[in-house]
Amino acid sequence: FFYINSTGSANVRKNGDYVSNMIELAGGKYVPEDTGESDNALSTMNMQMEDFYNAAQSADILIYNSAIEGEITSIDELLAKNSLFAQFDAVKKGNVYCTGKNFFQESTGMAEFVEDMHNVLGDADADLTYLKKLN
């Protein structure tokens, strides 16, 4: 669960954050793992792209957070942000999803997000509420 900010860094949620917890509730494993617990009040941190690659290159699924820097609609748009994404396993397999712009505005949707994640992780062909598969 990340986005690429204006400086080209990957902004990720820290371990123990509610988003990483929801991914784990759905049966997934949040990557990157080495973000540490919240040392400060911020629930996010920036990672240099090379560090993000080392942490997430072999992830089965990538989820791009479109709520912050704008929605992306294709894997090509992700590759335009950094060509290194072409080497990620999830990109090679077409397992890239994004959130909608409204993701953080609907706090009552946590259960639906967990359900979306569960369906994505289980390869269920279900309608998704907060996630959209990129082509």
PLM-predicted stretches and their roles:
Residues 46-58:
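Short helices/loops that flank or line small-molecule/ion binding pockets
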Residues 6-13, 38-42, 100-107:
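Second-shell loop/turn segments in exported
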Residues 1-27:
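Basic- and aromatic-lined ligand-binding clefts that recognize polyanionic substrates
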